[in-house]
A protein has these predicted regions:
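Hydrophobic/aromatic beta-strand patches that form the interior of the parallel beta-sheet core
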Residues: 38-42
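Internal alpha/beta domain cores that form substrate/cofactor-binding pockets in large enzymes
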Residues: 32, 36-37
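An acidic, phosphate/nucleotide-engaging active-site surface
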Residues: 2-31
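Glycine-rich beta-alpha junction loops
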Residues: 5-7, 43-47
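C-terminal functional extensions of proteins
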Residues: 48-157
């Protein structure tokens, strides 16, 4: 499973959504997904591992990475924010196994604050700020809260 992990382009470079090379910050894990029978990619911008499955159409969308990654996965989850797609997957797995596995909204907020304190930047604004792809902490936590309510209806521990 790859979540929001930059994949290489046709030229084997790693580009952020603005076309800037970030190869020096990326391990070449793309090779782990080649020829593997079952794999999952979760992405939002076109440059993430898995989005190579849509490499032919991504260049036609203004807000997506061009050139896109070419690294494919057997399954692809696309969401407005990659984290949200991952949370949806975890909620689905929670339902299947009958156990609540999803992080709480407060724990997620704490984690975001910690990584920002360590120097992480927001993927949309390119600024060291408590946001996730342009969404502030409150806006971002709404997805987890909604998924937690969904799980509440399932009587999961």
């Amino acid at each position: 499973i790859s979540i929001e992990r930059c994949g290489f382009t046709e030229t084997r470079d790693y580009l952020n959504r603005y076309g800037k090379s970030i190869a020096e910050f990326n391990a070449k894990i793309d090779y782990l997904f080649e020829g593997f029978p079952v794999s999952v990619g979760i992405g939002d911008g076109g440059n993430e591992i898995g989005m190579g499955s849509l490499a032919d159409v991504i260049p036609f969308y203004e807000n997506l990475s061009s050139p896109p990654t070419v690294t494919k996965t057997s399954k692809l989850i696309i969401s407005s924010v990659s984290n949200w797609g991952a949370y949806g997957l975890v909620a689905s797995i929670s339902k299947i196994v009958g156990k609540r596995l999803l992080i709480s909204a407060n724990d997620e907020i704490d984690l975001i604050k910690k990584i920002v304190d360590l120097g992480a930047i927001d993927g949309t604004t390119n600024v060291n700020v408590n946001k996730v792809d342009g969404f502030n902490l409150r806006e971002n936590s709404r997805t987890i809260t909604a998924l937690q309510h969904y799980l509440d209806q399932s009587d999961l521990n």
